[in-house]
Amino acid sequence: SHPAGFHLCDERCAMPGTERFGDDERREVMEVLETGILFRYGHDDLRRDRWNARDMEACVRDYTDADYALAVSSGSTAVACALAAAGIGHGDEVIVPPFTYLATIEAVLLAGGLPVFAEIDDTLCLDASGIEAALTPETKAVLLVHMCGAAADMDPILELCRERDLVLIEDAGQALGAWYHGRSVGLFGA
């Protein structure tokens, strides 16, 4: 459990990403529903000084030492936003892992890109050799998913992306709390 109140994987889950919720989470959801305000912005006079999204963003920033954190509706939306911000569009190839949540692939397709599978390693994440083997002249980005609480081997991936001028987008939705050489995953990419 994080000091600010959100829970990482504990005895209630078999692995990160499979957490179950209990009485604490039910109470928190009901408190939000009782305000009648489900949106991040506005309705200041009605929210009874509850700023759940803003507080969660601050908590994530503090925990990961990130400069910014912005809550969106889902991991799918987060990946779609990152691809759009990276300028991924029609015909751009994006290297993705074959072991991932379907939203990884859907987000690339939504952006107009073409997902290209690359091999994963024992961490269940992409690795540099798998990425390199899948590269073509149309490759514009690598969408790296840190799976099941594991951090990918980032140094060789970062080096490859720099050498090939590839945008690196990290999906750390299944690995909040995972670190690589003292840095939170999700903070290495674009």
Give the label of every model feature segment:
Residues 1-76, 80-85, 89, 162:
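Conserved PLP-binding active-site segment in aminotransferase class I/II-type PLP enzymes
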Residues 31, 62, 133, 159, ...:
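Solvent-exposed polar/charged
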Residues 47-51, 73, 99, 126, ...:
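Residues at secondary-structure transition points
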Residues 58, 155, 182-183:
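Active-site phosphate/pyrophosphate- and oxyanion-stabilizing loops and adjacent acidic/basic residues
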Residues 64, 89, 137, 187-190:
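Structured loop/turn residues at beta-strand edges in well-structured enzyme cores
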Residues 77, 153-156, 190:
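Residue-level recognition of oxygen-bearing side chains
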Residues 84, 88-172, 179:
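PLP-dependent aminotransferase-like
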Residues 170-190:
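Conserved active-site segment immediately N-terminal to the catalytic lysine
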